[in-house]
């Protein structure tokens, strides 16, 4: 399994300033990042990139098939989301195994994306900024917090059992905002 803490093999761009945005489900990450993008700043969406990589990368396809089995993709090569979700949700170890395949690919894509940007500041929206250790890829990070109860109203379009399961997971995590050197901001 790849050591998620070690991104030293990747070439970090000298510019632009990279700011990570994270927060719990329904905290407003997407809303804030949409407003940032409206102001002309580039925003990299980690979840979207991870989904794209899982669907299109032959490397990831081969690794997930070897890990989970041939049913994770159908005969046409299309991801079978229920199979992947069942595997990930069955244990923390399984989730970590999938993360060890996908997260390094997302990190590499983010750094290449940064190199192509001309803006002095770029943003990364990442629900799992600290858990994925992507906070090591940004200069500053910010955690969006919203009053308890409000976030559920923002996520009401999702399946309720899924929301409850996700909230139980995220409620067990601790967050803070920090600069890359670990000082709280």
Kindly give the residue locations of the regions a language model identified.
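Short loop/helix-cap segments at secondary-structure boundaries that form the rim of catalytic
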Residues: 36, 131-137, 176-182
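Glycine-rich phosphate-binding loop of ATP-dependent small-molecule kinases
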Residues: 1-78
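Residue-level signal for inorganic ion chemistry
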Residues: 47, 98, 123
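Short gly/ser/thr-rich secondary-structure transition/capping motifs
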Residues: 2-4, 104-107, 121-127, 167-171
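P-loop/Walker A phosphate-binding loop and immediately adjacent motor/lid segment at beta-alpha junctions
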Residues: 96, 104, 108-115, 154-185
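Well-ordered beta-strand positions
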Residues: 42, 48, 140, 183-185
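ATP-dependent NMP and nucleoside kinases share a basic, alpha-helical "lid"
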Residues: 108-116, 122-157
